[in-house]
Amino acid sequence: MQEIRNIALIAHVDHGKTTLVDRMIYQANLVRQPENLGQLILDNNDIERERGITILAKNVSVTYKGVKINIIDTPGHSDFGGEVERVLNMADGVLLLVDAFEGCMPQTRFVLQKALELGKRPIVVVNKVDKPNCRPDEVQEEVFDLMCSLNATDEQLDFKTIFGSAKQGWMSDDWKNPTSDITPLLDAILAEIPAPKIVEGTPQLQVTSLEYSPYVGRIAVGKLTRGELKTGQQVSLCKRYDVVEKHKIKQLMVFDGLGKANVDTVQCGDICAVVGIDGFEIGDTIADSENPEALPPISIDEPTMSMLFTINNSPFFGKDGKFVTSRHIKDRLDKELEKNLALKVKPGLNADSFVVYGRGVLHLSVLIEEMRREGFELQVGQPKVLDKTINGQRCEPIEDLSIEVPEQFVGAAIELATRRKGALLHMEPRGDRTLLNFDIPTRGLMGLRSNLLTASQGEAIMAHRFKEYQPYKGEIENRTNGSLVSLETGTAIAYSMNKLLDRGKFFIDPGEDIYCGEVVGEHTRERDLNINICKTKKLTNVRAAGSDDKVVLPPPVKMSLEEMLEYIREDELVEVTPHHLRMRKILLDPMDRKRSGNSGDDE
């Protein structure tokens, strides 16, 4: 029997975990030495590469000194917390990767806490020691303190630390003596991480993730915790509420390098993919057909936020996208539910709308961005935070927020957070930067990032994670400025935009097509302002030729999808099409808005 090590990678966004796995893959000669290291092998989804975040957990396996090492790459963002917990169930130890300059960040803490609670043994890798002014030794102390505060056992606190630079491709026990490759890390994995326990008996495999193939449908992935599985074997699927179904395994695959290899039998402790089992959910157990024993189901974080998805019914609908009907959107959301655990979907008030529940703005905006790239057109409402009633009291989700800013911007950062009902817990100087910790309601985080970056000239680093439900903190003032709303459908003309520059700032370029009811800018005052920017200049003979000035407009404010979701008000929607993002009023007609009581002023 081949020896196995199952290991999960934990790291903060952008601390280099995907690069490290790529290095391990080269070390095991699975890929010939690359011409361009920039292409991350694991983040194989466009959005992941663009944003530099891992969303879905991936599995890769390398063989070193005859031992098979299964590496499971976990997402670092607590918005994808549903992914993290399942993945840790497959691992026997964890590789904690920290940046030698930044140290431990809240996201790392989130995953590490889950891993320590499950009793996994850690190895700490201090990465990026090639960075100028890094502080590897201090970071190692920080990790120790963090583990103490997370109630780690003495055995877990006696962890091994390896220093190195994944980018340059070396690891070493001492950061002052670089080596030529990453073998010290692989040796440490073999020495420190326990092999999975071999348990004789009837098979038990808990489905911890799933893959989808257009040919064979849904594939169950999990770690075989007891017994062995064979191709063609009859098994039971133990679902929630003691439901048991009989199935036959059509095909078994284990992870081999970057792909999968078909096998006839899977030994205990290995991670495998099972084909031929229909209708399984994450957390179900594949067990013996005669006397099935189920493993306890996996708990997944509850959603903290909801958003309304509806069909695109703006005047420009169907111009960009391939999929525009409510049936297309429903089918796509149902498909997403199969693989995205922390997501829930309920029907909306009318047939064309759906309420989608998720873990945060990032979680939901990644879904919207994926749909947009696939050719969908849809409209999305303002994100709403979910309240709970606990002991008769209205409670709301509170997040643990940490902000790192240069010293001169500390005042601005504290003011922004406290204005949104944030409570400053402690601040600690780190060189010329300061780390601030707050407890803040989830609704206070909406739009905070963009304001914070503006206030700190782009220098702030912000991270947050869900902490607990606490009593409602009271109203938070949202954006104070009204919108500039178009009165006409047509083309935006530079001449009329120039005349309205003193009224606010624009979100669109001259020459863009706009429609009546579209939000084209931000008003300088509180109320909305209805404006006509489709007026052209009358070219009659009356005016003197010399008195014309060239129109110079300041560049428009361009927002990303997340910024738009955080910016819109209750009576506005974001229209998402493959090539455009627009903001609009729910009621396009100014007279309808007047009747409903939030009409705005007319220009």
Label every PLM stretch briefly:
Residues H15, V31, H77-S78, F101-C104, ...:
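Conserved nucleotide-binding/hydrolysis micro-motifs of P-loop NTPases
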Residues Q204-M307, F317-K319, N481, G490-T540, ...:
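Conserved nucleotide-binding/hydrolysis modules and their immediate coupling elements
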Residues L30-A57, F80, L146-D158, L190-P203, ...:
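Active-site phosphate-binding and catalytic loops of NTP-dependent enzymes
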